[in-house]
């Protein structure tokens, strides 16, 4: 659940899948290596609050560049998305569209201990998102207009990773998610509605990664959220390398 400032508690269920591809690792100057990636995904969600129900379905397209030097890494991604919303309210059914664009930077360091059997990874993510809803007329006949939602999120975190035999890597992680610029203005028939925003929250959980070879890895994890929002995220992933690239 998401506890909105100046608003209701929202029950939020999200789901989706992503597919992407990476280039071969490229060598740059001063000891840097890098890889470029593209990805496309489907995302859906269902929100319920105060007797209202919203279903969202859409897609995302993005690109990422990642640099490595020794135990340090840093990545930059940019993505855009388009979604359709089917809403059911006390006045009837409504349909409208949303679009978004966003970018994020992530950097971290792998501190290797006990002959690389244990890794402590401090990391930091900074992201910016711009989300806008197309103007529409709701089921009550009111014209709804909203300013674009402009959100910045800062997320420092810490990850503890174990290197076991046969390519197994169990890990624990914790992140603090802080939203510092996340208010938008809604108007209905030129009347301003209350501003809503998301409270900071903590995300923590466990996972495991399995490396079958240099070209094949998979993972499964469960992340829990508390304080500003409550819930759990389950995710699975698999990566395979093809061709002759490194």
How should these model regions be labeled?
Residues 120, 125-133:
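Solvent-exposed flexible segments
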Residues 6-12, 50-57, 84-97, 130-152, ...:
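Solvent-exposed, glycine/polar-rich loop segments of beta-barrel outer-membrane systems
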Residues 62, 66, 143-246:
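Outer membrane beta-barrel transmembrane domains
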Residues 29-33, 125-127, 201-206:
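Short, functional N-terminal and low-complexity linear motifs
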Residues 1-119, 221-228, 233, 237:
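Outer membrane beta-barrel translocator domains of Type V secretion systems
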